[in-house]
Amino acid sequence: MAGLVKLSCLVLACMIVAGPIATNAALSCGTVSGNLAACIGYLTQNGPVPTACCSGVTSLNNMARTTPDRQQACRCLVGAANALPTINVARAAGLPKACGVNIPYKISKTTNCNSVK
């Protein structure tokens, strides 16, 4: 139940952050958070990366093919990181590598998403 509450907060935070952002991106924060929902436990607790989490990371990476999409995904991730006070920032930053995915920016609470190409 606590995980569902955290996920709901994550989705709401992403929607609030992404709402006023004008962009040509096809990705929504709902899509981003939906793909990464299985990662919440890993990012806030100890334990291995769930297979479903890595599937979501890979899927999201495959969807974010254009610069606007990558920037939007970045904004959603930064918003989510800031909305989850219990997030382990080191785990968040290392999540793509842990899943064997290479993204062109570091996931953190302070990433400048406008510089993502």
Curated annotation (Swiss-Prot):
MF-aspect GO terms: lipid binding
Keyword Transport in record: yes
Claim: Secreted is one of the keywords in the record: no
Gene of this entry: LTP3
Keywords: Disulfide bond, Lipid-binding, Signal, Transport
Pfam families reported for this sequence: Tryp_alpha_amyl
Protein name, UniProt field: Non-specific lipid-transfer protein 3
Family, similarity comment: Belongs to the plant LTP family.
InterPro entries: Bifun_inhib/LTP/seed_sf (IPR036312), Bifunc_inhib/LTP/seed_store (IPR016140), Plant_nsLTP (IPR000528)
Protein task: Plant non-specific lipid-transfer proteins transfer phospholipids as well as galactolipids across membranes. May play a role in wax or cutin deposition in the cell walls of expanding epidermal cells and certain secretory tissues.
Native source species: Brassica napus (Rape)
